[in-house]
Amino acid sequence: MEYFSERYDVIVIGAGHAGCEAGLAAARMGCRTLMCTMNLDSIGFMPCNPNIGGTAKGHLVREIDALGGEMGVNIDATFIQSRMLNTSKGPAVHSLRAQADKRNYSGRMKSVLERQHNLDLKQLEVVGIRIDNEGKVCGVITKNGAYFETKTIVLSTGTYLKGKVIIGDVSYSSGPNGFMPANDLSQSLLDLGIEIRRFKTGTPARVNRRSVDFSKMIEQPGDKRIVPFSFMSENLDRKQVSCYLTYTTENTTKVIRENINRSPLFNGSIKSVGPRYCPSIEDKIVRFPNKENHQIFIEPEGEDTNELYVDGASTSMPEDVQIAMYRTIIGLENVEFLRTGYAIEYDCINPLQLRPTLEFKKVEGLFGAGQLNGSSGYEEAASQGIIAGINAALKVKGKEPFILKRSDAYIGVLIDDLVTKGTEEPYRMMTSRSEYRLILRQDNADLRLTEMGYKIGLVTKERYDKYLERKNSIETEIKRIKNLYITPKKEVIEFLNSLGSSELKKSISLYELIKRPELDYFKLQLLDMDRPELNEDVQEEVNIISKYEGYIKKQLEQVQQFKKFENKFIPENIDYDEIKGLRIEANQKLKKIRPISIGQASRISGVSPADISVLLVYLEKKHREKLL
């Protein structure tokens, strides 16, 4: 029996990493928001790796934080180890990564949601989406018959839609980690004309700490200097736990090869597509037959648990094969399983059905975020969640949508790739996907995005004031060192020689001196005795801006060229069949994706530079005729 329950501005379906950011963004922007989850104990849960960040992913977390999101604050409060990756390389690829206490991460996120003004949290299963006569969303129906009216919906269902767990020849309907699957909602999406596909992902076994011989492994402690994810976090000095590096052996390869016919990945049981950059251990053995061993990282899942995550050994092999295989890994000879590894297949959508706002083209007011859109990873999900939540709120308020360009943020790259190019496999963010890596660094996320977040009403006054203080400190110090001249005195020349730097021929500003490859802002402190006391993050920003000024300037010039095409908008009512000279493939792709700008159109696979020229001529002609 159906009954009317309540009325909301925004309803978020799912409370994983995408759902949490979407719900918080909408509520913090003043919309009455309902977050639905099938299990209140699964909020912000980490069903796979127990960490946040990593290469490129750390950039995403910083960007979420700069916009006023929660992920960075949450991991800063609950991490058990912190490391900055890629420090031997340039600042563009430095990426922060933190091990999380999984239980505490989820618990704190739930607490934040429960305390959030404008946000209601309910345990219920949504089985249907209702639309009105104009094709706009108007509500959702739950399994228990409750009807909730709404203006907008954010779908963030993760791997729950028709989830199916596979372990060898055993398979059963399930969500991740034993949670219930959502088996009814997919049909509602199909009824709305939304294209559904199947992807798969997997996770390794969890093993008992007491059965692991760490003496055979290489300890990997956290960094002594802890760098926070959130620009709001301070004083994060705390005791950290270690991770451990170990390796597979010849016997690992032998066990897998002898049982490869029992692998659902290779015997045809799994037909869906998995993540390219997170292959299972059996997939790695088959794909790299000449590699003698593979790295395995042993990672704690929390401070108060014996569960260890075996990173690098994701598998869907039968349980007996998993145990035999794991016991061939160095240090795991007597390992005991606490949870078996598995693969999980799930329904998701073709992201080409989405606008850059993450709203479905076919259904007004319906937004998609996270693994539903074909991505993989907590950080990718949260990035889409905050954008979907922002745009759902802006739609309710009747305001212009919020779209991050590729030159604004990695989040912009992620979403543009999904909605413009689509993906045939779970999409993972990487620094190599961005054309503008040097200006999209993790250290300057606040300088790029916090102003935007404040204008749309998501960034708080407290955060904004802190951002202005940091920005002012950086600008003031840059100005100071530009006006601080170092003269070629004897002691200066001797000091520079001691650093392996050539002598000065004439006076030079400290700002210019920093640009020498062998020097930096920190090394030159002895030439700058009146240097003010500054936070380390401010000093690092000053160093990067000074040292890489030429490269940054060149990239900013490229961005200006890029924006010329990005700002040439294509009318929604354009008739591509009317454009003579477009190739058939280009016509079909443009009609399907319906790009919002020439820039987006130029990135569509199958649309050539010649097609773009034809399109530009057509738009210019129509502009002159004032018909569009």
Curated annotation (Swiss-Prot):
So where does NAD(+) get bound? 274-288
What GO MF terms are annotated?
Answer: flavin adenine dinucleotide binding
Locate the residues binding FAD: 14-19
Keyword Flavoprotein assigned to the entry: answer is yes
**Main role?**
NAD-binding protein involved in the addition of a carboxymethylaminomethyl (cmnm) group at the wobble position (U34) of certain tRNAs, forming tRNA-cmnm(5)s(2)U34.
Q: Which cofactor does it need?
A: FAD
Highest taxon above the source species = Bacteria
Cellular component GO terms, alphabetically? cytosol
Which family is this sequence assigned to?
Belongs to the MnmG family.
Q: What is the lineage of its organism?
A: Bacteria, Bacillati, Bacillota, Clostridia, Eubacteriales
Which protein, by its recorded name, is this?
tRNA uridine 5-carboxymethylaminomethyl modification enzyme MnmG
InterPro entries named among the record's database cross-references: FAD/NAD-bd_sf, GIDA_C_N, MnmG, MnmG-rel, MnmG-rel_CS, MnmG_C, MnmG_C_subdom, MnmG_C_subdom_sf
